[in-house]
Amino acid sequence: METPLPQELPPVTLILGGARSGKTAHAEALVLGSGLQPVYLATAQALDAEMAERIRRHRLQRAQGWLTVEEPLELPHAVADAAGANRSVLVDCLTLWLTNLLLAGRDVEAAGDQLSAHLADLPGPVVLVSNEVGLGVVPMGELSRTFVDHAGRLHQRLAAAADRVRFVAAGLPLDLKAPGGRR
């Protein structure tokens, strides 16, 4: 079997999708297909047994060769530190990062601005994964509504800064924005 040729990634790719939509698997395939050193920047925290098990399963599913960095709060700096000309960074996921920021009482909008600003100067490609949470009904609880509002604004900000934006549903990617323009 022939080894596929590396596929060049644009500087910034944003991948959105629902829970269990296949967005992370798609992002991993893009990063591995780049031929660069894959870096997995995880934002999840093992705050309960179910999340600890989920993190363990994710680690086992990834092929060997991934460098894993865990950073639940200081994502802009972690992305900048992990990026390199010979590396492709996958950030999974932005909505968990937002949750961490909200629960820590951080300024979510400022953190989103900081992340967006860091993306322009990275020496290698980054693939950002996030849950699209704005497709359902307006949540009843104030914290849930605040979270959905922050996620929507962050996604819009990052989509504007990204070279490629994809939406994944049922494992199928749909380009919302392709390198060089809109689709």
Q: Predicted regions span which residues?
A:
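Short, well-ordered beta-strand core segments
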Residues: 38, 89, 164-167
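Residue-level signal for inorganic ion chemistry
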Residues: 27, 58, 90, 131, ...
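Conserved P-loop
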Residues: 9, 13-81
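Catalytic phosphate/metal-binding cores of nucleic-acid and nucleotide-processing enzymes, i.e., regions
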Residues: 5-9, 85
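Helix-adjacent hinge/juxtasegments
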Residues: 64-110
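Short, well-ordered coil/turn elements that cap or connect secondary structure elements
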Residues: 35, 61-63, 84, 121-123, ...
